[in-house]
């Protein structure tokens, strides 16, 4: 959903996503005993890397970078914890109008997420339901591979997390990935996402 995405990067990202949904559970469960699943995950990783090397990333990675730097949370786990909440943030119908990307009246991110859902064959009676079903599918995939629900579940100390929160927020706001996010976040919105990811819903 990066504002730098193109048809070229979209094709790579969509195929990588489909491989992940198809093969990650088997690669996780069967390890070295399922060479096909591991091969396809390696392919997905490479294709995703080619996509984001050209289209950049977004605020999910910005927030995750600081969780790694301050709290040593592995980057993939940090992104997995955050992803659906960031998607909800990005898909807001009428977010605050930002002057940074004046070519957009408002972000069109929900349409991009629905394109992803369509590519995976996820259905819904309307766009809102399809989007929610897509988020549910992501949460189910996370559960299959042992991703815990919150930052707190990974043993990050609450006091130290809160003590470092403002620094993480400022650094995430300034992170190079934030500028490519389809909805430009306010610092208080980044803070809300951190707190939600720490404590859960």
Across the structure, where does each feature detected by a protein language model lie?
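Carboxylate- and glycine-rich phosphate/diphosphate-binding segment that chelates Mg2+/Mn2+
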Residues: 1-55
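Predominant activation on well-ordered alpha-helical scaffold segments within soluble catalytic domains
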Residues: 14-25, 42-46, 60, 64-68, ...
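Hydrophobic packing residues in well-ordered alpha-helices of helical domains and bundles
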Residues: 13, 38-41, 131, 165, ...
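Glycine-rich phosphate/pyrophosphate-binding beta-alpha loops
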Residues: 46-79, 174-180
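Short coil/turn segments at secondary-structure boundaries
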Residues: 8, 36, 129, 152-155, ...
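Gly/Pro-rich interdomain helix-loop hinge
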Residues: 70-73, 77-160
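Short, amphipathic C-terminal "tail helix"
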Residues: 160-201
């Amino acid at each position: 959903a990066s504002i730098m995405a193109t048809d070229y990067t979209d094709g790579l990202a969509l195929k990588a996503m489909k491989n992940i949904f198809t093969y990650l559970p088997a690669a996780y469960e069967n390890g070295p005993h399922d060479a096909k699943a591991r091969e396809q995950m390696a392919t997905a990783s490479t294709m995703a890397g080619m996509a984001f090397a050209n289209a950049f990333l977004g605020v999910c990675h910005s927030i995750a970078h600081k969780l790694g730097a301050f709290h040593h949370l592995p980057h993939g786990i940090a992104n997995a914890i955050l992803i659906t909440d960031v998607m909800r943030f990005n898909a807001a119908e009428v977010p605050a109008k930002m002057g940074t990307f004046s070519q957009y009246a408002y972000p069109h991110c929900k349409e991009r997420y629905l394109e992803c859902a369509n590519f995976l064959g996820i259905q819904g009676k309307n766009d809102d339901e399809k989007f929610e079903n897509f988020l549910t599918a992501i949460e189910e995939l996370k559960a299959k591979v042992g991703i815990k629900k919150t930052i707190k579940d990974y043993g990050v100390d609450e006091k130290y997390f809160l003590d470092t929160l403002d620094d993480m927020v400022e650094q995430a706001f300034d992170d190079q990935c934030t500028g490519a996010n389809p909805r430009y976040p306010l610092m208080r919105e980044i803070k809300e996402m951190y707190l939600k990811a720490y404590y859960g819903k």
